[in-house]
Amino acid sequence: MPAWPRFMSLRRQYLYKALDKNHQKHPIKHPHTRFLSRLFCALAVLFSYSIYQSFRTDLKQSGSWGCEMSWMSPSYRRLEWTEFISTRYALYLYREQGLDSEDTLSGHPVLFVPGNAGSYQQVRSIASSASKQYYEQVKARERNVVTGKKIDFFTADLKEEFSAFHARTVREQAVFIQHCIKGILQEYTHLPQEKRPTQVTLLAHSMGGVVARLAMDPITSISVDIIVTLSTPHILPPLALERDMDSIYSLIRWRRQHISTHPPLISICGGISDTQIVSDSCALPFFQAGNNSDIAVFTTGIPGVWTAVEHQAIIWCHQIRWRIARMLLDMSSRANTTAKLVTAKEWLLDYQEDETLKEPRSERQHDYSVSSRNMTFIGLHQPSKAFVAQQCNGLERCRTVPSVMSLLPFPNNPSDPFPLPGEGIKPSEVMLVAEISLSSTNTVVKINASQYGQTIAGSREHHLVKGNSWSEFTITMRYRYIRIQLLFCIRPTHTSTFSFYCGTLLTLPRQSWHLSGDISIALMSCTTGVAQKKLLQRTGQICDSVPYGRSCMASRVGCCGSSVSIIRFYQHRSVRTCKGFKLILVGEILSWNSALERIARRRMPICIVLLLLGATIQSQLPDFPMLHTFFLGVNQLEMVPLVGILGVWTFGLLCVVSFHLISTCAIFTTLLIPFKILHVAIWSRNIWTGSAALVSTDNNFYYAIPPALLVKCASCGGTIQKRHVCLKACRIALIILIMSSFSVGARWTWILSPIANAVLILFVASII
């Protein structure tokens, strides 16, 4: 008799008796359970729909983005090294056709590291912009424009591997990057000793930033001056499916804290439009932002960009690639790391004025009467900081008054949404805001401004806002501009419509200078990421700028708004739903009456109470180490009910599995695939690309035990005597899995896989 039919006959023979006893012991005759099941189903559907609609609304209102297309003429030359250790990866030198004609290398080296499934050719956008700007500066030398070194862009071909899903791939790529850094520096041995570069700048996209940081061991870090990452998940991995991936992140944090030669890190994030990398994960941990060397900035906060950017578009978006290329050019001429960081902050955290407009060819001088010691001047359509203010009292000579200047977006069409979709803000659609402080009011202010646009003035008032909401006096009919100053924040970076990093000004631009209307202000908390909207009425020709200071701007919008933060910050929680789907596959999907009879009525209330108790303790101990990684990862007491709601939701996904009814056994032969589907995809791709490192893997044969037990049962017809013991242990393990799937936190998702496999082992053992 064939093995599989014999297994089916054995299964029917031994299971029917157990089923009869089980049904006699636990008859399902509870009418109120039917009502409870329908109520839970309705709540689950309603809650899921609310989350989906909240996310769509938030993404539609705040996630619009606009970028200009970039153009280039790329060419690549593969570098062949006699001592090249890898036959799997390759290294290329980028050259812009028509500009980079020389074959010898004489500039500053920059190595590009692509991300998950990324191509080495993605370097072309930034590299092309750097070449064009360099040769434009060369032509402008007669105009006294400072010219930095030329940039030599190298790019690593990592064969478009799935580094986000496989920790071993990340480690192998990091080793390759270490050897690339050594090889790149050897390419400059033809230069005199004093002109040879001693350090390489790393430019990485997505998971390439994790690879670049992992390559920074004590030896390699000496040869790297700056690491610039684009949309890189620095805090949490995109999918924490392996323990080794968590070990990689722990090693990166340890090296940043303990290696004195570790290069500074500049993290550029795409914001809410980046649906692949969660914005909170792209920010930097508190200990990194507090060292005054690492920088994290969102593209919404970069002057001249003012828009969120999609994950892949951050590479080719012209507004961003132009500033990154210009930043790299200016950094190449700086002698030390401190000066390079100052240059980076000028381009990313504050507007870098156009050198050709420092002294406008023609200026207009205007006199303004002083109405307050604190004055604000706004220059419309003024693309540079060509602004000089002088205080004159009629008796003494006029003296120059220091001013604090910043550029703000000024779209030509007041009815357009912001950020502008399509190509975004044009370079001419900006205005200059200058703030000055005067010694007295009995004077006249003379303004020398650029010939572009017009200049208007007004007084400036300060109001301090404390707590989590704005008081009544802040919502007046007088103000067109609201400027919010973030004085201190728990986290170094946070995202909002216009908020980008701590210690800077958040400016909400007006929509019309002529018509009254409403300004929709969307603020995101740095601790919860929940948006709060408030409408400010504006009328009249008022050009005041009102700073508000507080520790951390506000949040609290209720369940739907909270759902937005949950679904955005825990996008990878869908992995846990997949775990539940695996359990559903191995058993027959029963009615809710049967499922809730065993799980919901008896164990779920106790588990929910424990979850709520743990979330309450978490909210009362916000500074306790590692406590923020559990549950929702937030410390607000009002978020505790969401823990219970999501707990019921999680139970509803996982408790529909039955262990006491006949189910299809054919699915058991593929139990290995659901658990390691990503690794199977990686193996398949490696075979397709002809990789020689197929056996270099860290997979655990523990996951092969369930199908091995099935093979044993089908081949020899053996059974396990104490089936009821395995069945009871399986139910206990399932409860542990349900509790763990909700409470372990986003960082430790890899814990669920071995627990789920233990459930399957016990389940298979109970039916054979």
Curated annotation (Swiss-Prot):
Top enzyme class: hydrolase
EC number: 3.1.-.-
Pfam family, one: PGAP1
Coiled coil (UniProt feature): none
Protein's UniProt keywords contain Glycoprotein: yes
Location of the active site: 206
UniProt-annotated location(s): Endoplasmic reticulum membrane
Alphabetized UniProt keyword annotations: Endoplasmic reticulum, Glycoprotein, Hydrolase, Membrane, Protein transport, Transmembrane, Transmembrane helix, Transport
A cellular-component GO term for this protein: endoplasmic reticulum membrane
Glycosylation sites: 291, 336, 374, 448
SUPFAM superfamilies assigned: alpha/beta-Hydrolases
GO terms of molecular function: phosphatidylinositol deacylase activity
GO annotation terms (biological process): endoplasmic reticulum to Golgi vesicle-mediated transport; GPI anchor metabolic process; protein transport
InterPro entries per record: AB_hydrolase_fold, PGAP1-ab_dom-like, PGAP1/BST1
Transmembrane segments: 35-55, 604-624, 642-662, 663-683, 700-720, 725-745, 748-768
UniProt topology in membrane: Multi-pass membrane protein
Primary localization: endoplasmic reticulum
Sequence similarity: Belongs to the GPI inositol-deacylase family.
Role, per record: Involved in inositol deacylation of GPI-anchored proteins which plays important roles in the quality control and ER-associated degradation of GPI-anchored proteins.
Entry-linked PANTHER family: GPI INOSITOL-DEACYLASE, NEGATIVE REGULATOR OF VESICLE FORMATION-RELATED
Protein name according to UniProt: GPI inositol-deacylase
Organism, as annotated: Cryptococcus neoformans var. neoformans serotype D (strain B-3501A)
